């Protein structure tokens, strides 16, 4: 018999529990307390870290969940570290349900089911009252757009973090130049397009390089999302923050 959804503000279910675990683990090191928005289209998070150096824009699509019930917009405040403490026990073949009951609107519930073990675990976590400051992202036309294997990007960032604090990224035609300098060494890596590697969907003219300098500390945090997808999407524009997009498995 189908569950009565009338008692829930939110009730969603996914078999992609591993992707949710990886996502929350990555977010907890960038965001502490943040708002998450549920509505009929999906799950959304737009927030900056405490230093306002990083903007996170996450969207999970309702139609990609096994079931999705959220008849009206619901905004909740959560502590990401506490959420990860509950969800880190999940394994890839678990089924995760996330719910908020009408009679307990100040708690979020996580139900983890494992068919193989015939087990069910339910957590309920207190929600936070966080002011809802809406962040609007204006449309931007980028000068360079590319895809790159996420595992290779992670390795490059890790290697350069051992040398310096910042990475200079320069797009020249169909090549990508990565540089970093430290007290004891420097590194320069030049990447060109390959069938299974770097691929430009929009390239700059060779005489008009597109470049910027970015913090390796934050890029290293981003690479915790590596296992979510095989490719990252990178968007570069002069005098503009670096945009890196990870697909959250098949969810968004």
Language model: regions and residue ranges:
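DNA polymerase sliding clamps and clamp-related checkpoint/processivity subunits
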Residues: 1-28, 33-162, 168-252
């Amino acid at each position: 018999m189908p569950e009565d959804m009338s008692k829930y503000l939110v009730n969603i279910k996914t078999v992609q529990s591993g992707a949710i675990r990886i996502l929350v683990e990555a977010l907890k090191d960038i965001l502490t307390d943040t708002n998450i928005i549920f509505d009929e289209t999906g799950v959304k998070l737009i927030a900056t870290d405490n230093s306002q150096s990083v903007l996170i824009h996450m969207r999970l699509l309702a139609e990609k969940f096994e079931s999705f019930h959220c008849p009206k917009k619901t905004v909740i405040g959560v502590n990401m570290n506490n959420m990860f403490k509950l969800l880190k026990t999940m394994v890839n073949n678990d089924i995760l349900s996330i719910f908020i009951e009408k009679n307990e609107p100040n708690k979020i519930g996580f139900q983890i089911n494992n068919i193989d073990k015939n087990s069910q675990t339910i957590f309920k976590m207190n929600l936070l009252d966080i002011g809802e400051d809406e962040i609007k992202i204006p449309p931007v036309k980028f000068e360079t757009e590319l895809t790159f294997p996420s595992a290779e990007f992670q390795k490059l960032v890790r290697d350069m973090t051992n040398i310096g604090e910042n990475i200079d990224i320069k797009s020249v035609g169909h090549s990508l130049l990565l540089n970093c300098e430290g007290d004891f060494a420097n590194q320069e890596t030049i990447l060109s397009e390959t069938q299974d590697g770097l691929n430009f969907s929009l390239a700059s003219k060779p005489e008009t390089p597109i470049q910027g300098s970015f913090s390796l500390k934050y890029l290293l945090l981003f690479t915790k999302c590596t296992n979510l997808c095989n490719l990252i999407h990178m968007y570069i524009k002069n005098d503009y923050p670096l945009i890196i997009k990870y697909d959250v498995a098949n969810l968004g």
